[in-house]
């Protein structure tokens, strides 16, 4: 079974779902669960074959990555570079052929990375790699450091 987590970034979600579709015919089960630490613990325990997600933060995955590596699994970015605290897009697996097969399937549908330009979004949204920015509210809502506008 493979798990993915379509994060709040709509472009990363599209990429995740492309991979989801490609993997659907190759595995016994696919699930979407939005808790990286829990899913990574399941991979370490052997309940799941793999987990992939995009645009993650270190505090979401550091403990899970340690569990998987100590259990003999594999945690890499989408280019097979071993996990560091700066890894944002990742694949976790029980290692070996499973890891390689998931990566090759994701690559076959261009789901190893996501491109912000590839998604048509409403004009009021301005996507950045690390956060979603929306046009600022009227100035009256903003206060200076003394609490005055």
Where are these regions (language model features)?
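An extended, acidic
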Residues: 1-149
């Amino acid at each position: 079974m493979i798990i993915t987590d379509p994060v709040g970034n709509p472009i990363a979600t599209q990429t995740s779902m492309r991979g989801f579709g490609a993997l659907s015919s190759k595995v016994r089960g696919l699930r979407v669960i939005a808790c990286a630490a829990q899913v990574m613990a399941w991979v370490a325990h052997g309940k799941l074959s793999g987990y992939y997600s995009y645009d993650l933060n270190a505090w979401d995955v550091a403990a899970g990555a340690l569990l998987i590596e100590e259990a003999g699994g594999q945690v890499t970015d989408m280019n097979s570079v071993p996990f560091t605290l700066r890894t944002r897009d990742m694949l976790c697996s029980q290692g070996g052929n499973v890891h390689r097969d998931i990566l090759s399937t994701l690559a076959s549908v261009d789901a190893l990375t996501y491109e912000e330009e590839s998604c048509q979004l409403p004009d009021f949204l301005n996507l950045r790699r690390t956060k979603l920015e929306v046009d600022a509210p009227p100035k009256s809502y903003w206060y200076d450091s003394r609490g005055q506008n």
